[in-house]
């Protein structure tokens, strides 16, 4: 039976930057599940109202890129939670804990990987 690995990522692209080599090495040995907690695009815009349509297009594009990249490793078990980029520290911790707890209970991973606690990005620290 294959081991199960849960990847908890702040944004789409963090999983590839942090675990791309791991995916390649273990793609035939492990089953992967990826969680994206934030959408990863809106924090690039100061005026979120003015650029609302552009932001939504960027979020959708980023999701499509993540799905395409993960498909290379045959990873299709992916969840997007779309919290606002750069603001995970403002989401009540209990809400994030519930998301992660539910995913752990459903997927039952043997291994959980996430960002380093020394990462400077607030979404990654949260």
Task: Describe these PLM feature segments.
Residues 1-107:
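Active-site rim/loop-helix segments in enzyme catalytic domains that contact anionic ligands
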Residues 99-126:
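Active-site adenylate/phosphate-handling loop in enzymes that bind or generate adenylated species
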């Amino acid at each position: 039976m294959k081991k199960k690995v849960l990847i908890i990522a702040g944004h789409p692209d963090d999983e590839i930057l942090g675990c791309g080599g791991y995916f390649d090495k273990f793609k035939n040995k492990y089953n992967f599940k990826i969680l994206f907690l934030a959408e990863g695009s809106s924090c690039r815009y100061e005026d979120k109202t003015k650029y609302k349509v552009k932001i939504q297009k960027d979020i959708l594009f980023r999701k499509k890129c993540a799905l395409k990249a993960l498909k290379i490793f045959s990873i299709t078990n992916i969840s997007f939670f779309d919290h606002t980029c750069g603001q995970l520290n403002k989401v009540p911790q209990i809400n994030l804990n519930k998301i992660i707890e539910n995913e752990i209970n459903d997927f039952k991973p043997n291994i959980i990987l996430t960002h380093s606690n020394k990462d400077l990005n607030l979404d990654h620290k949260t």
